[in-house]
């Protein structure tokens, strides 16, 4: 398709541009798309034919085109199709495999100390969101009216439906 042809051109360009960078340890196709397709209720949320198309298109891109292009352009560096590449919530039996995200503190409101127990081989995402430093906030908010979690400006900058509640929890 024209879309995949365009993606291939972008892949080649970016792989060649980035493959010599010392910080590129592995290539990753996406962040949490497979996780969402499998575990976030999308199979129930969308009609069966739409959900099946999601998977078909996912496979074509992340299990097909991207790794095929990487084999040609950067064959020695590993590729994972989605991050995390282990099961959600950092199950202990998965901790020695691949890389992991652990949302137990953020989404599950577990105490920070749980991170001493949930120690995967490679954790690429964990922790709790926060607001930016005050100098950054001052670029979009006025101190006299907007420096309140409930102000319209602060709500517009909070992208998580549970964000402010979790921040206040901790």
Name each model-derived stretch.
Residues 2-93:
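Active-site neighborhood of glycoside hydrolase catalytic domains
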Residues 27, 34, 61, 65-71, ...:
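Substrate-binding clefts and catalytic carboxylate motifs of secreted carbohydrate-active enzymes
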